[in-house]
Amino acid sequence: MNKLKKKKAGIKDFFKGKHGRNFLLALDVLLAIAFFAQPDLYYNPQAPDFFDRFYADSLIICGGLWAVLVFLTVKKIHFSAEVNRILTYIAGIATPFIAFLWLEFYNDAQFWVPIFSIPFLYLVLDIIVYYVIYVLFLLIFNSIRAASICMVVVTAVFGIFNYELTLFRSMSFIASDIYSFVTAVSVANTYQVQIDVDTAEFFMMALVLVALLLKLDKVKLFKWKGRIVYAIVSCMIFAGFTQVYVYSDYLEDIGVDFRVYRPQYKYRYYGTLLTTMRTFGYLHVTQPEEYSVNAVKKITKQYTENESTETQEKNTSTQNKTTKKPNVIAIMNESFADLK
């Protein structure tokens, strides 16, 4: 444990020192080179006028975010303990909401309709998902700064992954895709990653948010006794959350539904993470009313007995055999389909 602490302290001291800042500054330069190496992000050669060929919004937004990133890289910012604590708690309260707005505006730019067209109840339920995820990160890291950074990174990864997945198969992420991970990996090498202006801005915003959060000093949230209490409370929150969002019919009762094969058409009505959570409910398959395994066995018993008798008769004689078999009527219901 002491070796691990020393290693972490060494890494922290490196990035706080001159060599660490130079290393991060070199990464910023490489990021700018990577941007200009993709002309589609800022240049349209088919425009008739020279100045119209450049995407002003892309150059201004990405350029501005890059300038902020460079400033945060080279500038030493130190807050007093009291100010740092206040800013840390503000970050803890605001990060899930910022992640919600950030992801929804990105999806609005790519596929959906404006966030303000989503009904208020669905917006509230969507925001709750972000805060519950944030509670999980707080439980894991016991640090607001670390939980906020993880929230930003996970939001960025999910947003870009969902966008690329939709481009690849014309279908957004649903919960059953988890069981197709191996298949997805096997065909991933056939897909060409596509980066557009909105994705570049989304990625740059993630870097800026992480850089801002790293300017805060780490504040331990709970001591070990408080952490135990928080773990118990968190488990209660997760239990209630999964019961409402996954195992109950509440979301269905208030009209939250989705199309299995075109879920992105429902994302625009309910928000991204609320729709994603709704798809997890379809992994929980419940038995139809009056369904009984014993009743099925009782009905099929006479036919299985006849089948064994028929097999014996075939060995002795091909005559005088009974071939009584049932008529099977199958009623398919897609809602009872096991997506696993």
What would you call each of these model-derived segments?
Residues 1, 69, 130, 147-156, ...:
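Aromatic-enriched hydrophobic runs in primary sequence
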Residues 1-7:
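Short, intrinsically disordered terminal tails adjacent to the first/last structured region
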Residues 8-266:
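Transmembrane and membrane-interface helices of multi-pass
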Residues 245-340:
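Soluble catalytic regions of membrane-associated enzymes that act on cell-envelope
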